[in-house]
Amino acid sequence: MKASVFKSLYFQVLTAITLGVLLGHFYPELGAQMKPLGDGFVKLIKMIIAPVIFCTVVTGIAGMESMKAVGRTGAIALLYFEIVSTIALLIGLVIVNVVQPGAGMNIDPATLDAKAVALYAEQASQQGIIPFLLDIIPGSVVGAFASGNILQVLLFAVLFGFALHRLGEKGQLIFNVIESFSRVIFGIINMIMRLAPIGAFGAMAFTIGKYGVGSLVQLGQLIICFYITCVLFVVVVLGSIAKFNGFNIFKFIRYIKEELLIVLGTSSSESVLPRMLDKMEKAGCKKSVVGLVIPTGYSFNLDGTSIYLTMAAVFIAQATNTHMDVIHQVTLLVVLLLSSKGAAGVTGSGFIVLAATISAVGHLPLAGLALILGIDRFMSEARALTNLVGNGVATIVVAKWCNQLDNDQLQAVLSNKTLPNNEIKSSTSA
């Protein structure tokens, strides 16, 4: 039991952060020299931004069933995803502006590593909507991947996904190759995330050594602010949506409590995808709806990640005294409406998309990611839990709107009257 605790990434990161704080506090000069450890980890994350979003988007779109058969369901699902994700982004933006957890840190962006972000610094965005939209179109596909321009990669991925879907069986080989490549990419992410303790140690030691223990207070405020915001979003926003569609959000949370516990331990909503497919079908949602909404939602309906992205981006601006006027914040929202759709329900994806977003916006210092590197791991639980509840609610709502929901069965399982626990466990344990 003790060995498993020590091997836990959560424990390792927590220990690394503690050691980083102690080193930075008692030996500030030495702590400040640990900055390359955090910078190196950020560069590793940047390395796989483009391929992970390309694979996720392509397999998500190309893996859908017949467009004609599920056209209405897909359109309703995407409309729902866009509306609720936008609400999540706005809520995160409003609360971080009101609470201002990063105000007072007074971190000079010039002290952050410029070399670590040189690749993305070259992509400084031109002001104006027209240049911004034109810049989404790449000069070449290879150029989009080589430069790391995530919006260009995302555009190509969407077009590629639709084209691959139209090929049908003829494109199955290509689909299988990309899906296999996707597994390799996520395997790389898992390996990189094992280095998170080293990166967290370096980033935290540098932050405390350079700016003092007082900077840790603002980091704690960001974590608390984010968790409270996620709880409010689930209870108020998702709760209202659930009530409007005839079910209780708290009963639904109780229904998926086992899945929530798994996600809490893994920090990845993807870890319970097979279980969610099974449980949502047993909750009265037709299989065709469940098969479309749940997998698609893992890229297009990540409410917790949306809240995190706006809060983290503005926090970096506040901490580095980077002024963000209304135009800048609207631009941030527009970019996030696109880039957040490339996130995946795996640990670290939120941080990856945050890096992509900051690089695309161009106004914020990408090296500022080091400020939240040490605490990102501890916000991933709230992200994953909110994402999971959000996708479950979305499935029920879309099923109801498409007349593909057995409401009597839904009410029965939510009331714990006919919940087939044993069957669920046995069918999803493989």
From Swiss-Prot:
List localization entries: Cell inner membrane
The protein's matches in InterPro entries, at most eight in alphabetical order, are given as: C4_dicarb_transport, Na-dicarboxylate_symporter, Na-dicarboxylate_symporter_CS, Na:dicarbo_symporter_sf
Which residue windows are transmembrane per the record?
A: 8-28, 44-64, 76-96, 144-164, 184-204, 222-242, 289-309, 326-346, 352-372
Is Iron included in the keywords of this UniProt record? Answer: no
Q: Name one GO molecular function term.
A: malate:proton symporter activity
Matching entries from Gene3D superfamilies are given as: Sodium:dicarboxylate symporter
Record's GO cellular component, any one? Answer: plasma membrane
Query: How does this chain sit within the bilayer?
Result: Multi-pass membrane protein
| PROSITE patterns according to UniProt | NA_DICARBOXYL_SYMP_1 (PS00713), NA_DICARBOXYL_SYMP_2 (PS00714)
Record's keyword terms, sorted: Cell inner membrane, Cell membrane, Membrane, Symport, Transmembrane, Transmembrane helix, Transport
Source species, domain of life:
Bacteria
One GO biological process this protein is involved in is:
L-aspartate transmembrane transport
Q: Which family does it belong to?
A: Belongs to the dicarboxylate/amino acid:cation symporter (DAACS) (TC 2.A.23) family.
In terms of NCBIfam families, this protein maps to: PRK01663.1, PRK13027.1
PANTHER family in the record, alphabetically?
AEROBIC C4-DICARBOXYLATE TRANSPORT PROTEIN (PTHR42865:SF1), PROTON/GLUTAMATE-ASPARTATE SYMPORTER (PTHR42865)
What function does this protein fulfil?
Responsible for the transport of dicarboxylates such as succinate, fumarate, and malate from the periplasm across the membrane.
Q: What is this protein called?
A: C4-dicarboxylate transport protein
